[in-house]
């Protein structure tokens, strides 16, 4: 194709993504669009087609973004090339959303006709507006008995400020309104800008590792053209590779002769080293490089940290390789090696949130077959020492001694909770119990309220989301943003078994709850840790001060069983001998700590505050 033909083709390209709150019907709408455009034959069709990971299907959530090319013949008789980029809806995967939106010109905003606007809907709309996307509102699930499309239309206009007069009323499940949506994409979403004759600039928005072909890059071509045989260069590190294959997803990978401006597809170039590619990097041609890199993505900082250790220590290298492969298409995952006296060699990993942590753990266990121990999650604290230094600490075992600490600051988040009016009391009570400060509250409509609190991230990390869902019967929706660091009365609590600190059980706690929490965890550990041949004291300590203690009684053999009658001194001698043996055993004995003990540090949070 000459550049004139390519420019004509470019005018027919539409890149868009679908954004919505969890469960508002995003993946179902994507399925219907694939069916309508006959991208997938009815034989291959299955629900949630784009959610290719087993984990996504089981949980019914989208974790990874997906990019697909479809052809659609519009009412004007022209055939258009659509690139649909599917996005996750959960707060932990906002980074995935921001990446997919950067590869688009338009976004379909799906809102449930019964539930209306939710916290995540808002968060994702603001991301789309930041990227200057054309937003097409779609009111979905209009066939539900509780649907009220007019109310939702007003909500979209009042809360988000979008013109919803032309919002499509649809039901993805029943296939209503799909054609209208496709026509609106043709009319309203702008064609990609960019110059096919300019030097190549392609934005990497995802990548996967293939055992045979190396790292496969998923790219959006912003300027220029790329073909097999070209020599490409990464703009961040200057490394060059020879392109072996380019193509698109339909959802299966299909090879093509070229990818030109506006296209979304994949590039394989025998890239063997995972570290050579980074999501957000710009690909250009080695012999005709672009002047500057594209405006990439902002680097996401992990909010939650936890230790990951293989149960079998010989799996350490396998775990490292697995984490590197996961990091390829999940750029927000960070990790570095660490050792623990209790658990051996492992990694300190940073995650965007608890669901992210959960998903990574499950993917490691499923896809790479590695059994893991996870330590309790913690956040990044700013510890100011007496010699006026400030250290960032994400691992409780690295906390300086209490005598060196001047004060500690912890991260607060701005939590936005949307909830029906009748549950406002429950939400406020929960937020206050989690040390939250009330900011503001406003009514979205007659029944729904938007409550904003400043809450310490450490309190949200535990089980805030579960507690919020259970106290509002699942009606609340929740979104949070990092706010600021504030001074707090925090202390590090150590757990001692048989007089030895177990570093992996240490945690940071607010002074006010320290005694209660110490007491609860000691009692929990007493139930979990099996009895030994000797008595084991379990202690919770802040610095040198013991705040709680409980003893696991020793298992003991009845040494008097064979003494029928006889002298009391004989019995005493046997008992003394047993006692001396137990004492010797206690001095050299070590206590095995089961996996549940580490998890109990997590789950004890709520019992402390009942």
UniProtKB/Swiss-Prot annotation:
Its EC number is 3.6.5.n1. The keyword Ribonucleoprotein does not apply. GO terms for cellular component: plasma membrane. It comes from the Bacteria. Residues 11-193 form the tr-type G domain. Keywords: Cell membrane, GTP-binding, Hydrolase, Membrane, Nucleotide-binding, Protein biosynthesis. It catalyses: GTP + H2O = GDP + phosphate + H(+). GO terms for biological process: positive regulation of translation. It is a peripheral membrane protein. GO terms for molecular function: GTP binding; GTPase activity; ribosome binding; translation elongation factor activity. It is found in: Cell membrane. Required for accurate and efficient protein synthesis under certain stress conditions. May act as a fidelity factor of the translation reaction, by catalyzing a one-codon backward translocation of tRNAs on improperly translocated ribosomes. Back-translocation proceeds from a post-translocation (POST) complex to a pre-translocation (PRE) complex, thus giving elongation factor G a second chance to translocate the tRNAs correctly. Binds to ribosomes in a GTP-dependent manner. Belongs to the TRAFAC class translation factor GTPase superfamily. Classic translation factor GTPase family. LepA subfamily. HAMAP family: LepA (MF_00071). This is Elongation factor 4. It comes from Streptococcus pyogenes serotype M6 (strain ATCC BAA-946 / MGAS10394).
């Amino acid at each position: 194709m000459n550049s004139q033909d390519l420019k004509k083709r470019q005018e027919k390209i539409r890149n868009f993504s679908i954004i919505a709150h969890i469960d508002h019907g995003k993946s179902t709408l994507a399925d219907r669009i694939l069916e309508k455009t006959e991208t997938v034959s009815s034989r291959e069709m299955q629900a949630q087609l784009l959610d290719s990971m087993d984990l996504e299907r089981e949980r019914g959530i989208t974790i990874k973004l997906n990019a697909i090319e479809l052809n659609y013949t519009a009412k004007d008789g022209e055939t258009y090339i659509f690139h649909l980029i599917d996005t996750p809806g959960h707060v932990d995967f906002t980074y995935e959303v921001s990446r997919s939106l950067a590869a688009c010109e338009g976004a379909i905003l799906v809102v449930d006709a019964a539930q209306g606007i939710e916290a995540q809907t808002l968060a994702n709309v603001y991301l789309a507006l930041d990227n200057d996307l054309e937003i097409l509102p779609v009111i979905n699930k209009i066939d539900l008995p509780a649907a009220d499309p007019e109310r939702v239309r007003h909500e979209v206009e009042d809360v988000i400020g979008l013109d919803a007069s032309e919002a499509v009323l649809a039901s993805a499940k029943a296939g209503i309104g799909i054609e209208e949506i496709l026509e609106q994409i043709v009319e309203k979403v702008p064609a990609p800008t960019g110059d096919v004759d300019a030097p190549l600039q392609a934005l990497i928005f995802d990548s996967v590792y293939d055992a045979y072909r190396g790292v496969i890059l998923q790219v959006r071509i912003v300027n220029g053209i790329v073909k097999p045989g070209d020599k490409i260069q990464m703009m961040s590190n200057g490394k060059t590779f020879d392109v072996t294959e380019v193509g698109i997803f339909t959802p299966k990978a299909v090879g093509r002769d070229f990818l030109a401006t506006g296209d979304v597809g994949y590039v394989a170039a025998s890239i063997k080293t995972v570290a050579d590619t980074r999501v957000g990097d710009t690909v250009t041609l080695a012999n005709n490089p672009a002047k500057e890199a594209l405006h990439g993505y902002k680097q996401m900082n992990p909010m939650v940290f936890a230790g990951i250790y293989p149960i079998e220590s010989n799996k350490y290298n396998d775990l490292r390789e697995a984490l590197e492969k996961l990091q390829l298409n999940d750029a927000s995952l960070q990790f570095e090696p660490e050792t623990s006296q209790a658990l051996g060699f492992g990694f300190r990993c940073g995650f965007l949130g608890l669901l992210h942590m959960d998903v990574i753990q499950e993917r490691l266990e499923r896809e790479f077959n590695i059994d893991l121990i996870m330590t309790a999650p913690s956040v990044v604290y700013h510890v100011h020492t007496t010699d006026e230094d400030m250290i960032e600490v994400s691992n409780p075992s690295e906390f300086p001694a209490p005598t060196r600490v001047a004060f500690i600051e912890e991260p607060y988040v701005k939590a936005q909770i949307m909830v029906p009016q009748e549950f406002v009391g429950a939400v406020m009570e929960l937020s206050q119990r989690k040390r939250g400060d009330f900011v503001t509250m406003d009514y979205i409509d007659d029944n729904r309220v938007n409550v904003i609190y400043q809450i310490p991230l450490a309190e949200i990390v535990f089980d805030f989301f579960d507690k919020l869902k259970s106290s509002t019967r699942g009606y609340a929706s929740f979104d949070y943003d990092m706010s600021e660091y504030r001074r707090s009365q925090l202390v590090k609590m150590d757990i001692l078994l048989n007089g030895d600190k177990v570093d992996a059980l240490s945690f940071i706690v607010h002074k006010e709850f320290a005694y209660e929490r110490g007491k609860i965890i000691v009692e929990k550990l007493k139930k979990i840790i099996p009895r030994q041949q000797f008595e084991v004291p379990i202690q919770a300590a802040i610095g040198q001060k013991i705040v709680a203690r409980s003893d696991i009684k020793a298992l003991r053999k009845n040494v008097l069983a064979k003494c029928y009658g006889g002298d009391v001194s004989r019995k005493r001698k046997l008992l003394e001998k047993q006692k001396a043996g137990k004492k010797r055993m206690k001095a050299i004995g070590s206590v095995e700590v089961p996996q549940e003990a580490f998890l109990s540090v997590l789950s004890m949070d709520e019992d402390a505050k009942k």
